[in-house]
Amino acid sequence: MRHPLVMGNWKLNGSTHMVNELITGLRQELSSVTGCDVAIAPPALYLSQAKQALAGSRIALGAQDVDVNLSGAFTGETSATMLKDIGAEYIIIGHSERRTYHQESDEFIAKKFAILKQQGLIPVLCIGETEQENEAGQTESVCARQIDAVLNTLGVAAFQGAVIAYEPVWAIGTGKSATPAQAQAVHKFIRDHIAQKDAAIAQQIIIQYGGSVNADNAAELFSQPDIDGALVGGASLKANAFAVIVKAAAAAKKA
């Protein structure tokens, strides 16, 4: 049985004070929670501080992006070896904000996936359609294309131990969310798409939902059979709000 994963993406938010305060709150809120893996991805500048603050807890450290190069003349970038060295485990790639604001292509994101696997890190591959694509009935074809960029270059075995986060772009930070039934349908499509290559890998892969996940909709989302947790944005910046989502995932998957 798949173990749910709830991960907080802090995006461009944080300060030295906020990192300590939020992690202290998370440790208190989640101290007795079992049955759900938890990770947070602070901005790169605070990863070392966050790692120290997380010491001795069950909360894993993640990061929001990675470069395709391991070292060299690449000003401003962060490499997979650096993230591994500092203790990060789950690395978000392909977030729609990176795809949109930094013009990252499916092929470029597949290179990031490859470098993370080579370094023994866990890729959290974000996929999802825009509102325009959704209205045009292209949700499945867009998700398939984004997955195939990895499948066609690395093979299905690369998805062993990886994470996919389905984040409909129209639901990120908008307050809109896919209904549980809508989200489940896409998650099932994603799993079935990978199962065409390898059913066993498809069954073990964690597929998170992301896009305005909050305390009100978390329990119903997690009750769906193919939704294995969440990639949480805004709600991950408040310990109590994030904890409610983690507890909902743990409870739903134990049921």
Curated annotation (Swiss-Prot):
Substrate binds at N9, W10, K11, G173, S212, G233, G234. Transmembrane segments: none annotated. PROSITE patterns: TIM_1 (PS00171), TIM_2 (PS51440). Its EC number is 5.3.1.1. It catalyses: D-glyceraldehyde 3-phosphate = dihydroxyacetone phosphate. Keywords: Cytoplasm, Gluconeogenesis, Glycolysis, Isomerase. It holds the Pfam family TIM. SUPFAM superfamilies: Triosephosphate isomerase (TIM). Pathway: Carbohydrate biosynthesis; gluconeogenesis; Carbohydrate degradation; glycolysis; D-glyceraldehyde 3-phosphate from glycerone phosphate: step 1/1. Signal peptide: none annotated. The active site is at H95 (electrophile), E167 (proton acceptor). One of its GO terms (biological process) is gluconeogenesis. CDD domains: TIM. GO terms for molecular function: triose-phosphate isomerase activity. The keyword Transport does not apply. It is found in: Cytoplasm. Its main location: cytoplasm. One of its GO terms (cellular component) is cytosol. Involved in the gluconeogenesis. Catalyzes stereospecifically the conversion of dihydroxyacetone phosphate (DHAP) to D-glyceraldehyde-3-phosphate (G3P). Belongs to the triosephosphate isomerase family. HAMAP family: TIM_B (MF_00147_B). Homodimer. NCBIfam families: tim. This is Triosephosphate isomerase. The gene is tpiA.
